[in-house]
Amino acid sequence: DHVYGFSDQKKGNLMCLEFMTGKVAWMERVERELHKGAVHAADGMLYCLNENEGWVYLVEANPLGFREKGKFQLPKETTLRDENNGKVWSHPVVINGKLYLRDQDLIFCYNVKG
């Protein structure tokens, strides 16, 4: 019934829209770590990956409001992404309780089973 994603109007807005009407259910200005990127929904949660610094936010998929459950930053173990070069443009994926994230020439796997 709802769609979650980033607003292009202002940096740092994660938002929830009613699918049928396009009405904004909520819009949250998130810290600079999460101003633009990719969102994946799984098991009632949103896995939000920032394209610049590799921040990952776990947010409850709830049309009543923004509820952050946690965050972490991908380790900077690649030389292909630095302050002046490279973006994390891959999409997070959750399969069988495992969160997969790719950063340039690396892939990370995290256990996200509750």
Model-derived regions, located:
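Noncatalytic, solvent-exposed loop/strand surfaces
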Residues: 1-114
